[in-house]
Amino acid sequence: MVKLANPLYTEWILEAIKKVKKQKQRPSEERICNAVSSSHGLDRKTVLEQLELSVKDGTILKVSNKGLNSYKDPDNPGRIALPKPRNHGKLDNKQNVDWNKLIKRAVEGLAESGGSTLKSIERFLKGQKDVSALFGGSAASGFHQQLRLAIKRAIGHGRLLKDGPLYRLNTKATNVDGKESCESLSCLPPVSLLPHEKDKPVAEPIPICSFCLGTKEQNREKKPEELISCADCGNSGHPSCLKFSPELTVRVKALRWQCIECKTCSSCRDQGKNADNMLFCDSCDRGFHMECCDPPLTRMPKGMWICQICRPRKKGRKLLQKKAAQIKRRYTNPIGRPKNRLKKQNTVSKGPFSKVRTGPGRGRKRKITLSSQSASSSSEEGYLERIDGLDFCRDSNVSLKFNKKTKGLIDGLTKFFTPSPDGRKARGEVVDYSEQYRIRKRGNRKSSTSDWPTDNQDGWDGKQENEERLFGSQEIMTEKDMELFRDIQEQALQKVGVTGPPDPQVRCPSVIEFGKYEIHTWYSSPYPQEYSRLPKLYLCEFCLKYMKSRTILQQHMKKCGWFHPPANEIYRKNNISVFEVDGNVSTIYCQNLCLLAKLFLDHKTLYYDVEPFLFYVLTQNDVKGCHLVGYFSKEKHCQQKYNVSCIMILPQYQRKGYGRFLIDFSYLLSKREGQAGSPEKPLSDLGRLSYMAYWKSVILECLYHQNDKQISIKKLSKLTGICPQDITSTLHHLRMLDFRSDQFVIIRREKLIQDHMAKLQLNLRPVDVDPECLRWTPVIVSNSVVSEEEEEEAEEGENEEPQCQERELEISVGKSVSHENKEQDSYSVESEKKPEVMAPVSSTRLSKQVLPHDSLPANSQPSRRGRWGRKNRKTQERFGDKDSKLLLEETSSAPQEQYGECGEKSEATQEQYTESEEQLVASEEQPSQDGKPDLPKRRLSEGVEPWRGQLKKSPEALKCRLTEGSERLPRRYSEGDRAVLRGFSESSEEEEEPESPRSSSPPILTKPTLKRKKPFLHRRRRVRKRKHHNSSVVTETISETTEVLDEPFEDSDSERPMPRLEPTFEIDEEEEEEDENELFPREYFRRLSSQDVLRCQSSSKRKSKDEEEDEESDDADDTPILKPVSLLRKRDVKNSPLEPDTSTPLKKKKGWPKGKSRKPIHWKKRPGRKPGFKLSREIMPVSTQACVIEPIVSIPKAGRKPKIQESEETVEPKEDMPLPEERKEEEEMQAEAEEAEEGEEEDAASSEVPAASPADSSNSPETETKEPEVEEEEEKPRVSEEQRQSEEEQQELEEPEPEEEEDAAAETAQNDDHDADDEDDGHLESTKKKELEEQPTREDVKEEPGVQESFLDANMQKSREKIKDKEETELDSEEEQPSHDTSVVSEQMAGSEDDHEEDSHTKEELIELKEEEEIPHSELDLETVQAVQSLTQEESSEHEGAYQDCEETLAACQTLQSYTQADEDPQMSMVEDCHASEHNSPISSVQSHPSQSVRSVSSPNVPALESGYTQISPEQGSLSAPSMQNMETSPMMDVPSVSDHSQQVVDSGFSDLGSIESTTENYENPSSYDSTMGGSICGNSSSQSSCSYGGLSSSSSLTQSSCVVTQQMASMGSSCSMMQQSSVQPAANCSIKSPQSCVVERPPSNQQQQPPPPPPQQPQPPPPQPQPAPQPPPPQQQPQQQPQPQPQQPPPPPPPQQQPPLSQCSMNNSFTPAPMIMEIPESGSTGNISIYERIPGDFGAGSYSQPSATFSLAKLQQLTNTIMDPHAMPYSHSPAVTSYATSVSLSNTGLAQLAPSHPLAGTPQAQATMTPPPNLASTTMNLTSPLLQCNMSATNIGIPHTQRLQGQMPVKGHISIRSKSAPLPSAAAHQQQLYGRSPSAVAMQAGPRALAVQRGMNMGVNLMPTPAYNVNSMNMNTLNAMNSYRMTQPMMNSSYHSNPAYMNQTAQYPMQMQMGMMGSQAYTQQPMQPNPHGNMMYTGPSHHSYMNAAGVPKQSLNGPYMRR
């Protein structure tokens, strides 16, 4: 037949049709024309003609469909024709091929045990001659497709079994699920009715088949067949019509059958839904929705399906696995095939290929993975490939694939998104398929895959083929395949720039291209693996996106619209800008920034969870944009007040001053926030270098510009924004801290300063921070206390010179004047000075209105208001605490600046002023207690409300004060100074005035606002008291020659008259109360942080008490008698500012009637508040003063302070003095020469002002005797025991005389502690004391609460002080006995023979000191106390001198010493670790923080007291009190680091300090820190049992270094002899001189204690060890001791005592602190509150009281504190301490913590005090609760605790008021004895910080919620303080360690935060403490983790605690 068309054209057209069809398009005329014309150039007309002709010819088929014409090749008609070509001749044959036989032959021939892969079968068959003959002509894909189809059918029919990619014959005659054969059903279990089917009715059957209409007689085949009828509708059918098999028919007849219309799902029994998705079981014909199947099905299964009901169990399981394998295969298969190819390469090149695979492989795989599954692989083919390998369930290959997988799995998301390990394995296997197959098949497979992947199994098969090939026939993988694979892999790698598999040792990436720089990286960074494996990464320098190649980068740069960081620019000067990037807003940017930073940072843990952080990005700007130079990150709500968590400068910008710029900028922000800041500890090596250089330069420049005689660490902290711990460590590093005559003094090394300034002038800094260019508002207004303080410091710095002059004048005047005059002078001078300072500050503040400093000016205004509007103030405060604060800050900015000048000048004045303020606060605080509503506000202005309360409560005192101080007040007020001074005094003088009532930390912690708000009274009072303490500690600015400056110790007398603060306090308290009412409207107080208020109040109260004491002392001491240094300090503080007003001593008395306690007796008696606390507060300032100024210039003259003043001062010194005593003791060591000169005087003063401070007591038996008249009665029993222990230990520790004083301080502190304890035990006694001392104490307490209320501390202090006063009066014997015992033991343990001597010598002193300390507690800033104590402890170690300067100094020094000792003086380090043992410094730290700290650091009294008490009466009551004091003291560390930013940071800084000075030691050597924290604490506890003093000292040191918990724990430990032992052991470890040594020693300790979950018992044994260990621990103790002994030869002996126990019980010690905490709660809710109140008051208000400025932090911290220790809550320190013992902190900060500590280190103690013993550690939670309960009950914690709580309730009420939920926590916590105190603490802490209340309330619940911060606060504090230590050791953690989630863990979430903040710390700690921690806790790193993880667990723990 002739063809019409041209055959050539027809051929062309057929080609075109094929081509079009190949493109999956319909061969239309248009497409055919286009194809032919493009190929052959034929025109369209011709093509259409030829096409028409060809159709006529029949050579082309024309198909019309819906009006569209298509053309086909009749020989190859698409799908139908596809087989034709192959089959053409063979198709028929092929169709005749028995595929089942072929497959069987292949599988049998391959004979592979696991089964054969599709590939293997295909290759095998292709090798068969008959098959190759059949299919030789057909395309490979045709054979492959048919084989796959046949295999699928075989599987469906059960002939083949498929296992992953492997196929094997079904030997059981296809009884696969799928087989329809009878066998398969017959092997199924018999069917039975389901429960829901049995009861249902059956419809009447219709006897006709619905299909064939036949009956049972005749079916379709005309044969009889039974009908099956539907049970629902009755419709019937023949089984044959239904196509049922006989087996199925039999089974169905036994069931309730449903027809297809009625079928319901047997699982969900829902007929209506998803009928299309219903499967019918081949065994019972029931219906199931696919989603209702078990496991749920995503696709209709092929072949036979048996439901889960009929499926045999085993088979069911297999089915499940099979389904899982299928699903995995589905995931991996689509990707699997392509991936398989890639995988082959991958498997071959296990190294880089995974990446390569992801790169080149992905594309191919995508093509291959046409199946739906391939979609997932396309983007993540690399991942998926790996996954594929895992996905396949080949048993033999799983491990193989797994390994391959893991290598490739490291892509960023792979590990997270791989469906399952199996899936990944399968892919790995797939990868193994021969490369050739992969590569070759890519093209093929793509098509084939596209063909078969439509079927799920196809996808699997594809993979199977690859896998089969890989696994089934590996012989098939030829050498050629391998070579091909390698070749391709190399090519792929070259494209990406990867030369070979990455070397794990090599940094990846080793180079980055960043902007115009190519930077060699220093470390590896966790970039996603595909990036991190590349040798070079390309980063966009603006958005920081990372890319693989320069091309991608260039393309990105064209599109990237960024030219600066995605945030607001907050600073610009010249070409330098800083942007504040919020991690929550610009998450990706911040993550990329962290990844970039890690390339240049050794260890960094934060990469992806950047939300809680702010990133301050420094850029250098040019026309192109803002080029990244570096950045620092800070946590948004850091409890530790860390202002930097990570800092990095890119290498190309290094050594150009940018690092310093960023550090300076971070401190500028901290100052704007109104709080002292500190970098997160532990610091890295480079970080420590950078920071130490910065601190040195800043401090030297500050000293250069500050010519004050009295410069305190607190003041320095305010001026610089650097936390006291860091300052202390730096001063120590510069050798500018010395311990003289029982106090730490700052030595001005003029040559050093001048040299530095000369260098600076030669080499000007290239870039400097210009505060004027900062446009930034703090996220949170920090607690007013610290922030304002810091700002005040800055203001002071600006106006310090004028102030100094004024101060000097005032001091000189005040020296001559009586105490009242001194106090007035303090007020007036301080006011005057402060106004000057404040004025400059005001301008600064105006610029930084947001800053707390701004608040200060505002405060000054309110203070005026407060004067006239006390009530007004209160009301306002309630409403507008925050607003008022802010308003005040803004409004008073100018006045504040004036004040700032004055304030700076008259640090002493300020301190005195602070005292007055404290008095005011105290007076106000009682009302505040009454008016709990104020408490939350007080948080904002912590000092304000307490002041208000004090004003209300002791209007008379206030009036008197105001009257007295009115002279000054008029001046000050006229200058506007007074308000400012108060604020300033609070801020700066709190540090300086550890002794001044300021010890109610509010002044310091209180942001300047507080001080200003109630500047007169608060400040004056604080100033006076502080100043006295400061005078003793800091008043002395010893020139380099150590010559005493104008305010020598001898001048202490003059200075004593100077305690104008005290006289002012009494007179001014009432006066100021009036003034506060008038001058400080409520708003003012509101603005003042609660701590400030508390401080002010407590300081007022204390002042009143101190004034009384002073008056008594003055009566006795009118002649120049050496009053205890703390007294001297107090007086110095009081006097120096008050000197001009010295003539108004009566006023002071008048202001503070002896019968009337300024502070609530509770406050007075609050152990935490006791001397240690006040000392803490004042001591820091004192140390600063003494250091900058002279040792306590004011030699307490007999007539220096009236007895009231003395008693107040005694109380203050007690509270202040414990630190002052610590300082004093250390200073006495240092100033021993001076004391030799002034010794007589000071002794006289001491005796005259017996309770003035432990040191006072030691120095002046006369003074002490006087106070002891009251106090001794109650204290004598205690003192007897304490002193016995004290004396014994002192004899042991007799070498260091300062330690004796410290012992005295410890005793005093312990008395205070005991007061706290007795608040539980002797609440009745406390009541008596309250009655006896109620008026003075109330006023005192009022003062103190004012100060401390700012942090719950005020409240606690108040009640504590009241209790203290009462207890001191009545219970002093009892309380002091336990407290003293504890203190003595602690102190002795912390040990210094001096302490012992002092203890014996100071027994009376202790009594007096106790009273005095009680007040001082309030007045002392816990932080100051801590810092001083740390210093004291460390210095005590070094020379019991240098650091006793201030608590802050001590704490800082202590921490520093950990560092310094390790770095400079290993022994010192140990000393720091062993502080308590050496100086009682540790105890001091621990006890001193509350009151113990003072004693332990300054005087054996405190440690002896606490320690002695602990030893003497294991009853937890006393221990509780000491513990509490410890907590307070420790809280000073922890809480202060949280609350008291200056001090708190110091505390945290302690840890930080440790990390600063011996970051390596403390942080890197967790054991050192641990020892310090846990060791010291534990050691403390341990020591307390064997060496009460040493243990406590150690604990103090630890606590200071580590945390409140430690101290509390130590205190607890001391309380419990077992605990003491535990405590001692860690102390020994702690005593290790260098962190490393500490670590070394500590590891055992830690090990001991890490086992303590079980080893809580171990700790028990270790505690016993500690007892024997006193000598065995010397190894550890020796290290500690060595640093101590070498630094302080006398202290060493105590350290040995303490240390051996510590050493043995290093871990136990760590935990002992927790028990101490428990004991603290035991000691009494009031006691605890007192401690914490004081701590907050002292620390929070005084040093770091920043409730408002760091409102969130403070609040959180407070919450933490509240949770941690209801009593110590005011500061977050206690909580911080209990941070680790979060559960403790939760339930009862003290209690819970004690319990955890107890369990671990204090288990013995716990046992001693209660049944829950060793297991406590493991069951820390349980322990906490039982322990707490037991302890409480043992220590009167139960009912007495409740009583105390009741006693403290006012304070709590205060706090409650301050913290809205405080009262609730109080109540809630109170429900349980354990938590009873906690609530107090909570309430109190809440007061300072609103959060605290809630937290206390929820102890367990809120803990986590608020605790996030609270816990953080606590934990962070703990971490801070114990950063390396605590985390490592986590006394708490270890103890909590067995706790469900780490008792700490409640705080743990915060801890996590803390970890974040503290991340580096924890990190360093981990390195430092891995051994100890690893042993003790889980591991050092674990600690870190635990800290982080603890958050949640802690919550759990806390919850349990709460429940308990």
Curated annotation (Swiss-Prot):
The modification N6-acetyllysine is found at residues 172, 350, 355, 604, 815, 1007. The record marks 1117-1118 as: Breakpoint for translocation to form KAT6A-EP300 and KAT6A-NCOA2. Autoacetylation at Lys-604 is required for proper function. Autoacetylated. Residues 787-803, 1043-1053, 1065-1078, 1107-1118, 1224-1245, 1288-1305 have a biased composition (Acidic residues). Residues 1-77 form the SAMD1-like winged helix (WH) domain. Keywords: Acetylation, Activator, Acyltransferase, Chromatin regulator, Chromosomal rearrangement, Intellectual disability, Isopeptide bond, Metal-binding, Nucleus, Phosphoprotein, Proto-oncogene, Repeat, Repressor, Transcription, Transcription regulation, Transferase, Ubl conjugation, Zinc, Zinc-finger. Residues 52-166 are annotated as: Required for nuclear localization. Residues 95-171 form the H15 domain. A zinc finger (C2HC MYST-type) spans 537-562. The record marks 1546-1547 as: Breakpoint for translocation to form KAT6A-CREBBP. The record marks 813-814 as: Breakpoint for translocation to form KAT6A-ASXL2. Residues 504-778 form the MYST-type HAT domain. It is found in: Nucleus; Nucleus, Nucleolus; Nucleus, Nucleoplasm; Nucleus, PML body. Signal peptide: none annotated. Residues 312-664 are annotated as: Interaction with RUNX1-1. The modification Phosphotyrosine is found at residue 899. The active site is at 680 (proton donor/acceptor). Component of the MOZ/MORF complex composed at least of ING5, KAT6A, KAT6B, MEAF6 and one of BRPF1, BRD1/BRPF2 and BRPF3. Interacts with RUNX1; phosphorylation of RUNX1 enhances the interaction. Interacts with RUNX2. Interacts with p53/TP53. Interacts with PML (isoform PML-4) and this interaction positively regulates its acetylation activity towards p53/TP53. PANTHER family: HISTONE ACETYLTRANSFERASE, HISTONE ACETYLTRANSFERASE KAT6A. This is Histone acetyltransferase KAT6A. It comes from Homo sapiens.
